[in-house]
Amino acid sequence: MADKRKYTRKYCKFTEAKIEFIDYKDTALLKYCLSERFKIMPRRLTGTSKKYQEMVEKAIKRARQAALIPYIVDRDNVVVNPFEILG
């Protein structure tokens, strides 16, 4: 029989840190929920709970409206750490 894969249990970083509110101006906190092309990462990849995932999505969308985070990145200019561009 095939060996079963052992998965590491993902946990919510926000629940562990006991964060009550996610501010859209805190781009350092939001970068953990964005991919290298500035897409919002799903819960199954980040391990974020439903409550905090909704708060993160709302904060990211507000940060995009305020031009703190770009909507998209050109395919040719994808960087390893996208927050190096933001300063």
Swiss-Prot record:
Keyword RNA-binding on entry: yes
KW Nucleotidyltransferase (keyword) present: no
Keywords linked to the UniProt accession: Ribonucleoprotein, Ribosomal protein, RNA-binding, rRNA-binding
GO cellular component: cytosolic small ribosomal subunit
One term of GO molecular function: small ribosomal subunit rRNA binding
GO biological process per UniProt: translation
Top-rank taxon: Bacteria
Subunit record text: Part of the 30S ribosomal subunit. Forms a tight heterodimer with protein bS6.
Chain's role: Binds as a heterodimer with protein bS6 to the central domain of the 16S rRNA, where it helps stabilize the platform of the 30S subunit.
Family: Belongs to the bacterial ribosomal protein bS18 family.
Protein name: Small ribosomal subunit protein bS18
Organism in which the protein naturally occurs: Campylobacter hominis (strain ATCC BAA-381 / DSM 21671 / CCUG 45161 / LMG 19568 / NCTC 13146 / CH001A)
Gene: rpsR
